[in-house]
Amino acid sequence: MSNQQQQQLPRQLPQPHPHHHHHHHQQQPGQHSEFPLPDGWDIARDFDGKTYYIDHINKKTTWLDPRDRYTKPQSFEDCVGDELPVGWEEAYDSNIGRYYINHIAQTTQLEDPRQEWKSVQEQMLSDYLSAAQDQLENKREMYDVKQQRLNLAQEEYNHLNKLAASRSSLCSSSSSMSRHDPELLRADLMLARERVRQLKQELNHITNDISYTERGMNTLYSVGEKINARQNGCYDIAEVQAIREEMLKVHKSLVSGEKVREELMRSLVQIKNELSRQQINEENAELLSATSPFDRVCVASQTDLCGAGEHLNGGARFAEMAKTKLQYAEWRKHIKKLQQQLADHVERIEPGQLESDKDRILLIQEKEKLLNDLNSISLKSRSAEEKLVIQQTRHKLEEDLKEAYEATNTCVANRLRFHEEKQLLLAKLQEALKSTNLLEERLKSFSSESTFSISSGSSLGSLSTASSKSALSFTDIYIDPFAVGESPIDVVDLQRRSQRLFQQHQRLPPVHPAVQLQQQHQLQQQTQPQPASEVSLSPRSSLSIETPPASPMKYNAIADQPQAQAQAALKEEPTYANAMPAPPAYTAPPSVPMALAAVRTHPYDLDSTVLDCMMLEAKLQKLNLSSPLNLNGPLSPISEKPSLLDLPQEMLSRSSSTSNTRSVSAAVSNESVAGDSGVFEASRAHLPRKELAQVQIGLKYLKQEGVLVVSLERANNLSALWTATTDNSQVYLRAALLPNSLTSIRTKALGDFQKPVFNDTFAVPISLDKLLTKSLQVTVVTMTGQKEEIIGTVQISMAEFNPDDSTLKWYNVLSSKFIPTFESLDLPSTSAAAAAAAVAASNNIINNNNNNNNNNIREESSDESTITSSQTSTLTRNQAPPLELQAQIAEELPEHVRLNEQQCSDDDDDDDEEEDEQQLVGTLGLTHSGCMLDAYLENMKQEYADKETNTDCAFPPEKLRSQTQLLDDRPVKRSQTFTPSAAVSKNRYNCRLNRSDSDSAMHFGVTPHTFHRGAVERRSLRFQPKATKSVTKLHHTHIPRTSLDLELDLQAQHSKLYFLNDQISKLQNLKEVLQKACDNKDPLIAAWAIENEEFQRLVARADPTKCPEERLLQKLLMKTTKEIHKLRKTKVPKGCPDLVSFKEKMFFFTRKGMSVPELPNDFLLPDAQAIEEEEEDDDEDNVAETAIAINTALVASSNRNKNLSEHHHRSTGGAVSKLTATPTPAINPAPVATPVPATSNANEANGEQQRYDYVVDRNYGVEV
């Protein structure tokens, strides 16, 4: 190779082989292109493009650039930033991840040599072992104290037994006032025997705990010694790969073993039920049908047999579904908030600290009980030496208790407070999961009539980790599903009881701060409203609940209000969420019943569509906006009226009755079509809300008398409509039936604007036919001296009123600020004539305009569907107002339509879950306002031409432009796919770059931006494919796993396998004993199986008769636990180690898992020792085979290190012996990729001797 080639080769960057994806080395030979190679050096490339260097003088090859010794740091102390010193290289493996190569020492390691995380882990392991040793000492001391109590109890039992056996005491002929009453003595004897049995059982539990803790500590000690025995305390890559494969094998054994355990537990449930039957039959056969687990009858689900809302019509069903969807989203958001709070609590209490506190408090209790036992001993029959020992023991116990209480008060108080807060959050989370599940089932009941689907995939707090399918995560290894959802350790209760005993002993008043904390939390829990646990399935009550409006076209331009302000604003406000399970942030006033306070409808009915549009037009003019309202939005299939979702809540009209909805089937919904095409993404406005003024109105119609009873009960927050300027201002309500009402009714005037209570009832004679054509208008009027002013209006459609039912509902009050030019619509006095005349005049003007205009406003339906209508009105669509309007009237929209704006971009991988977070658009039925609406729209400033859908495009010449403008100058808005049917000027043709005509109703984005899930713009408009990332970009900021992490993961898997095998063995023994007891009808064992709490908890986990909701809740809790862990990991700063996770790993080894109860020795059957030899059926054969397989896996895994070292030695030796004959890396570099392939291809390279007798080792880059 010439010198010119030698100077050019270094400038060539390595080109990775397309099939080489296993290892990536970060070498950049181009960085030294300005420096020539030393004399005698050459550059070459292997088969995958990796550059290596040839030393012709020493006849060696290496991966290291010889020029690095002049440009790179010589040691780690000289490194700056992410630099590595000379001889070190960072590489990447697709299975293992990043690892590091030390070419000088010819070693590889998993840890980053620049980081000190390994030393921090070793120090943490040492500290934890020290703390675990203290905890173990507490357990041993507790064992000693309990042993002393057992000795005292045994002594007392022996004493009573002797008295009972004495004929002089039991068979005495003395009177009943003798020294020992036989009946009392027998009772004392039974109590003493039971006390001895219970103490023995507790002693057995403590022994098991001690052995479990000792085994875990021994495992941690062995892990530390094993890592310290390694060179540099690191595993090489071959060992890491072997450990990973072994972990996967153990995981497979765990999966199969867990199936066996579940089968055994199910069989235990059946045996327990059979024992319960036998026990009941023996005691009272009549109770069998009442208490048998298999004869229960549950009628809880009968209300769902026909489906929720099966009897409802289309509009009512869709409204109910929309309301339920909103509540479901609110609960999901509440669950995420609770998950976030729980993730914050994890860092406050170190893993294992609560267990240590429990042991400390239990030790105090044991000492207290021992002290009481010693105080109850009679010293009369004792010797002097025994008396001295007892007195010394008492004195020592009193001193120990004093010191223990002082230490407990100072150290445990804060942890108990954090633990209690965590338990409250867990209880709220459990309640939230229950309520979410109920709402989810209710939403699924609408699936037969809806195109929307609900998935229970994961909660909002879920975060995608995108881990490899072949790798085990932290939650897979260290989270025990049987430990999730168990009754937590009530350390606070233990502490209170212990404190009470100490205070009684010392006769001191309570001073422990934990008691005060508990009382405070109880008070807060009483004052804070909790989510309801039951769902009302009544169609009338559920449909009368408000569905807040929202627009899919808006974006959130308003910053979030502080949470405290939002809660304060909603505290006294009755909302829709109270009728169904709702987050605690939304409550009704205590004086209002839940079923009524939650009811709130809009102030205007469906007949007031024109008035709504006029109000919004006035609002636009007030805001000085040039473009008026554009009614081109998506229309629901059950509505022929614009949904008006973009209006403020005070302007919306909505029917709340259930029976007289007159909805008409119209065109196919844009939402359903676009949703089916996969391009529709519904979004919702995320805007804060203010307090709304409301009026509670009751309506009832007396058919026999022909009288409408109107009850104006109370109002709420009228100060939001008007601020009193003087102290003598008063407010009253005035109501009238429009149109053509000559009389009006009014309430008494009150000075309270916040919560005035009127309680006025009026009877209005009117026939039912006329009533259904009327609208009830209620105005809020203020009086300041002699001056009256209308500040708000409520309008209720009587066409939707159900005369067979009475209603009492809250209605939002529309402020008069929104209708400054239409104040004449309100009644100025007790007479309604002026108002009726004004309305009639407005109708005449609109009708005249309608007759003068020849073009009706129409627009093509989505994907060319036919419009079916029984009305004379035409189909229109509601489009979002301009962006300027959105920014101006944003504060008028309710806050509870803000659906999870913060978690929309959390998980880009869960499309199914994201679909669940989309809201349903509630549709409103059309009555008689179509013609009026068309007439009004034709008089708007900007009109739209009547054009049919056609695929032929014909633009007229520019010379005909003036003539065309004279005919019709209204712009035509179409999608790119479809073109106008007639000749249209290009200036009038507003083309939207959307995929199909079903997209024409979607918002046309003004600013392009990258894709964000749940954002305003459509994905098809905003998604830009990102450039693929290079696989060689390995600069991650997270802390990688160390060898200590890897060894802990492996030992955790082995520990789980060991205890799983032990549990299976105990369950098999227990099953055999209980089965024989069932066959023999043993009453003792049957009583034990029914009364033993530990056994009851065990079988309750696998009870097939358990309510499906409970099983689903258990799964949700398990999933939520994993999501909390993932959420907490996201809080760890980049580049910082996760200290809490490492502590949880260590705590796993000393944490006690599921325990299998053991029968007392007195209950064991004589032939219970030969359980393993008996085989009843094929299922037990499978159980035995699986247990043998697990045992085999345990034995095989114990020789891992030995096999690893031998395999590594043989592989290295084989590579050395055979690779030395390989001639040149340039001709045959493949055999040196890894030691194993090198042995297989060495024979092929023996006959290719050319120039050099050395090769390149892919890991170390030196001659071998």
From Swiss-Prot:
PROSITE patterns: C2, WW_DOMAIN_1, WW_DOMAIN_2
Subcellular localization, as worded in the UniProt entry: Cytoplasm; Apical cell membrane
Compositional bias ranges of the Low complexity kind: 1-14, 513-544, 845-856, 864-876
Coiled coil start-end: 129-215, 258-288, 319-445
C2 domain: residues covered: 691-811
Biased composition (Basic residues): 17-26
The keyword Acetylation appears for this protein: no
Keywords: Cell membrane, Coiled coil, Cytoplasm, Membrane, Phosphoprotein, Repeat, Transcription, Transcription regulation
Main location: cytoplasm
MF terms in GO: kinase binding; molecular adaptor activity
GO cellular component: apical plasma membrane; cytoplasm
InterPro entries xrefs: C2_dom (IPR000008), C2_domain_sf (IPR035892), WW_dom (IPR001202), WW_dom_sf (IPR036020), WWC/KIBRA_Hippo_Reg (IPR051105)
Taxonomic superkingdom: Eukaryota
Stretches assigned to the WW domain: 35-68, 82-115
GO biological process: one example: negative regulation of organ growth
Region annotation Disordered: where it falls in the sequence: 1-40, 513-545, 845-880, 1200-1254
Subunit field text: Forms a complex with Mer and Ex. Interacts (via domain WW 1) with Ex (via RXPPXY motif). Interacts with Mer, Sav, Hpo and Wts.
Family recorded in the similarity comment: Belongs to the WWC family. KIBRA subfamily.
PANTHER family assigned: BOMB/KIRA PROTEINS (PTHR14791), PROTEIN KIBRA (PTHR14791:SF29)
Function in brief: Regulator of the Hippo/SWH (Sav/Wts/Hpo) signaling pathway, a signaling pathway that plays a pivotal role in organ size control and tumor suppression by restricting proliferation and promoting apoptosis. The core of this pathway is composed of a kinase cascade wherein Hippo (Hpo), in complex with its regulatory protein Salvador (Sav), phosphorylates and activates Warts (Wts) in complex with its regulatory protein Mats, which in turn phosphorylates and inactivates the Yorkie (Yki) oncoprotein. Kibra acts synergistically along with Ex and Mer to regulate the Hippo signaling pathway.
Protein name: Protein kibra
Protein species of origin: Drosophila mojavensis
